[in-house]
Amino acid sequence: MKVIFMGTPEFAVPALKKLITHHEVKAVFTQQPKAKGRGLNLAKSPIHQLAFEHQIPVYTPSTLRNDEIINLINKVNADIIVVIAYGFIVPKAILEAKKYGCLNIHPSDLPRHRGAAPLQRTIIEGDRKSSVCIMRMDTGLDTGDILMKEDFDLEERITLEELHNKCANLGAELLIKTLANIDNIVPITQPSDGVTYAHKLTKAEGKINWHESAYKIDCKIRGMNPWPGVYFSYNDKIIKILEAEYLNADHHFTSGTVISDKLEIACGSGILRVKKLQQESKKALSIEEFLRGTNILKDTVLK
């Protein structure tokens, strides 16, 4: 099958690799190179780099909402468009430009966690099950019909990186199965109940509220690393918690109280045991390394 691919980050790479192996990728659309590092050198997106290595034509428009881009897509000899974490809204004229429309990989149990941050919200909300869906896109926000879906259980303390990799690889496999059977698949309309939205994360969400349960804070730590990160302030410095574990232990302390010299912190319910953290502008440290240089005394109440 002849394919136009639209995507940008690492999450989309396994799918493009599979398409290059099993189909004919006629063109790739991705976001423009961005300045990175101290030298602010322009860096291609992971998808741009992969397409470049395979000599696939790459386009980096600043928007899809103009006639020039729509005409370009119409001229590309393709049967279908695959869109994965592209970063731009796809207008109706492009959704309908090819025989089989536009397909999307969405890493959640739709209609739960529609929107920009399904992986993060899955972990933050403490979900114990999830899915990867192959969806035929329409003009709504992740409202299209489901062509193929695979459910799976989540490990209790899965990290964002682990869930990202699992869904990216599973989505790539499902995409190839979908394309192989696309003429025989009966699309399934998403149910109207159970709809939730996985809104984009904000930096403010990362500030710890010690009145929440230790379990909830641990979910946020795993779901918000690396960005925005979960943090507290101490001596006017921002400190990110990169890894912790929660203890379902009763206590009588005020929320936010440091109850041991190993940085165990009383929460609204339970206790958070910090294992790895990072002070602003410094490298990540284990709790042992951190406490050798920064002494957060027992009975301190963190804000």
From Swiss-Prot:
Catalyses which reaction(s): L-methionyl-tRNA(fMet) + (6R)-10-formyltetrahydrofolate = N-formyl-L-methionyl-tRNA(fMet) + (6S)-5,6,7,8-tetrahydrofolate + H(+)
Taxonomic superkingdom: Bacteria
Keyword annotations from UniProtKB, A to Z: Protein biosynthesis, Transferase
Binding site for (6S)-5,6,7,8-tetrahydrofolate: S108, D109, L110, P111
Enzyme class: transferase
Alphabetized InterPro entries for the sequence: Fmt, Formyl_trans_C, Formyl_transf_N, Formyl_transf_N_sf, Formyl_transferase-like_C_sf, Met-tRNA-FMT_C, Met-tRNA-FMT_N
Gene Ontology cellular component list: cytosol
Pfam families listed in its UniProt record: Formyl_trans_C, Formyl_trans_N
EC number: 2.1.2.9
One GO MF term attached to the UniProt entry: methionyl-tRNA formyltransferase activity
Database matches in HAMAP family: Formyl_trans (MF_00182)
Family: Belongs to the Fmt family.
PANTHER family recorded: METHIONYL-TRNA FORMYLTRANSFERASE, METHIONYL-TRNA FORMYLTRANSFERASE, MITOCHONDRIAL
Main function: Attaches a formyl group to the free amino group of methionyl-tRNA(fMet). The formyl group appears to play a dual role in the initiator identity of N-formylmethionyl-tRNA by promoting its recognition by IF2 and preventing the misappropriation of this tRNA by the elongation apparatus.
This protein's name: Methionyl-tRNA formyltransferase
Organism: Rickettsia rickettsii (strain Iowa)
Source taxonomy: Bacteria, Pseudomonadati, Pseudomonadota, Alphaproteobacteria, Rickettsiales
